[in-house]
Design a protein with these regions (language model features):
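Conserved glycine-rich
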Residues: 194-195
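Short alpha-helical Gxxx[C/S/T] motif in the catalytic ATP-binding
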Residues: 177, 182, 186
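Conserved catalytic submotifs in the C-terminal HATPase_c
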Residues: 65-68, 87, 92-102
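Short alpha-helical segment of the dimerization/phosphotransfer core of two-component systems
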Residues: 39-44
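Short helix-loop "hinge" at the ATP-lid/N-box region of the Bergerat-fold HATPase_c
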Residues: 121-122
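Short conserved segment of the HATPase_c
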Residues: 153-167
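Short beta-strand/loop element within the Bergerat-fold HATPase_c
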Residues: 128-140
């Protein structure tokens, strides 16, 4: 969970640093950065509260507050929030989602899922690489994929990657920390929505796939 908390904290520090280093920043851009910083600070508070919730309850019993979700808006906004983490190593996020693609789900909890997956994709991708996020409708489901190029996950680790306290660091070198709850939490949230999450990794490409019912 420390890994999850570090993500919004890094964004807050990154955007505040940009604001501090550029006092003459255009007002519109400054307002955007301040807004993102405040949002991530609130997100940090939510994660801390969720930590205590997780210690008391089984995730499968958590109530889902479902509503209509605009996937393009959610995923593009998430990519923008990771900007401070991407630029130091020349990484980018490409979002390819059709306009108007929606699904019915808990926006806050699914944002947690997508944040966890993107965070790992960024951490384990090569410098100057591009992380591709795509979504499409397949029958009655929405399929979202996160693709990054970097050191692969060993095949023997793929079956346990969504277990609590599993650490990707044991198989792939990175500077990230954490207790290894992020992907386990993601799986529980996806399952609660009646969906599925899985990963494929070979050579130098890793793809996380989330399948969710549209309604």
């Amino acid at each position: 969970l420390a890994h999850d908390i570090k993500t919004p904290l890094t964004s807050v520090i990154g955007y505040l640093s940009l604001l501090d280093e550029a006092p003459d920043m255009p007002p519109k851009q400054k307002a955007k950065y301040v807004g993102i910083t405040l949002e991530k600070a609130y997100r940090l508070e939510q994660l801390i509260n969720e930590f205590f919730e997780i210690t008391r309850f089984n995730l499968q019993t958590i109530f889902l507050n479902k509503g209509k979700i605009n996937l393009l808006f959610m995923l593009q906004q998430m990519a923008d929030e990771f900007y401070p983490m991407l630029t130091p190593q020349g990484k980018q996020v490409s979002v390819n989602v059709p306009n108007g693609l929606t699904l019915w789900g808990d926006a806050d909890k699914l944002a947690r899922v997508f944040n966890n997956i993107l965070k790992n994709a960024i951490a384990y991708s090569y410098e100057n690489g591009v992380i591709d996020i795509a979504a499409e409708q397949q029958d009655k489901n929405i399929v979202i994929t996160f693709t990054n190029h970097g050191n692969p996950i060993p095949q023997e680790k793929l079956e346990t990657i969504f277990e609590k306290f599993f650490r990707l660091d044991t198989s792939r070198s990175t500077n990230t920390g954490g207790a290894g709850l992020g992907l386990a939490i993601a799986k529980e949230i996806v399952n609660a929505h009646g969906g599925n999450i899985f990963v494929q990794s070979n050579t130098e490409k890793t793809v996380f796939t989330v399948v969710l019912p549209q309604k």
